Amino acid sequence: MPQAIVALVGKPNVGKSTLFNRLSLREKSIVHDLPGITRDRKYAKANLFSDLIVVDTPGLEFAAAGSLEFNMMQQSLVAINEANIICFVVDAITGILPIDEECANLIRKHNKQSSTILVINKTEKPIILDKSYYKLGFSESICISAKHGQGIYELGDIIQNILSEDKKINVLTTTNTKCEYNQQCPELQLAIVGRPNCGKSTFINAILNEERVLTGPESGLTRNSVEVDWKYCGQLIRLVDTAGVRKKNAVTQSCELLSVNDTFKTIRFANIVIVMIDATRGLEQQDLSIISYAVNEGRGIVLVVNKCDLIKKKEEFQKELNRLVAYSVFQIKGINPIYISAKEKFNLESVLQKCVLTYASWQKRVTTGTLNQWLAKAMSNRPLPFQSHGKRVKIKYCTQTKARPPTIKLFCNNIESIDESYKRYLINNFKLNFDIAAGVPVRLSFVKGKNPYR
């Protein structure tokens, strides 16, 4: 189905992200009083209107080439160039400033074909529009309050009228191998998480083969989670770049706290999580905390070590890190890191293959009959312990209650007598027997009772 793109454009802190959240009916963009929170393009289906994609953009700031502000503006220019309709957002409280006039000229220069709507935000109270608004030269204008939802439906009417009147409008189609937003949510939700500056955004750009998200030597460049739909070997994937996660006591600014919370929210909604480790810093406690959180949420884990091009004694380094992972990552025994260089595009294919395989394991189901045959063999190879009164503990029956991740319910006569080591044995044996990827957590639920089918 064809989908038109509406780009929200303007100087920093005029309320573009608030309007984006309002139009998409989801809090996908972080909103903060501090200017420059949005640094990458964010796409979402506008749930208020059918067949419409809305794009949040970084604030337009005119700066020297190579600066962060300049690179952010390049992100906005991509959105301006591809948009069918541009909502040029200005601030009614500050009024029209010289930078607004520069932004208007920039829009006209880079997109002469699309219609532009002047959206005057923060008009909670009625205002009188002076000539400075009209001097911007846009025929369509509307006063709204994105924060309070005033004028949103009226804005929607203007957008729909433009789309219906302009028969020549070229709209986005979702038949491309890689598109920025797909109306149908892809099967595999793949989150890339890790400490700041470990190369998450560089990894995204490397596999997409384009500068989709901002990168640089500065720590903490990514603030919002950024979603990109993509296809790999026939598998639809939603890649999600996230803000780096530092230790709690190191997070002092409220905007960083919002970014970290957004990252943890992304983990909760992901299927598979790539936990990226900086090879120059090695495995740290914060990496283990991220892994532990993702495992507790039931996400599949793919462990990736980036920046391996900066390591001189690679064999010694990998041997030592493998040892540390085997010792420290006890929740998912047997997981092996994948060593890459996102900057040099080295070994990226191995990561993608592992993600697809882990996803298949994560949603695997085993029939009840096959499962009980496995259980009988596992208990035969390693019998259960005796109870205090000399009677052996018995697991009488098991069934898989859910996948994503695999969850097994086992009925036994004495739950307390089954220790943690035997539970780990069952999990490891199950994964080995049914070819479950090492990064997939398997959950066991023990219930005291008889076989419910006898």
Swiss-Prot record:
Single biological process term from Gene Ontology: ribosome biogenesis
Domain (KH-like) ranges: 364-450
Domain annotation EngA-type G: ranges: 4-167, 188-363
Alphabetically ordered keywords of this record: GTP-binding, Nucleotide-binding, Repeat, Ribosome biogenesis
Transmembrane segments: none
Gene3D superfamilies given in the database record: 3.30.300.20, P-loop containing nucleotide triphosphate hydrolases
InterPro entries in the record: G_ENGA, GTP-bd, GTPase_Der, KH_dom-like, KH_dom-like_a/b, P-loop_NTPase, Small_GTP-bd
Pfam families for this protein: KH_dom-like, MMR_HSR1
Residue sites binding GTP 1 per the record: 10-17, 56-60, 121-124
NCBIfam families for the chain: GTPase_EngA, small_GTP
Protein name per UniProt: GTPase Der
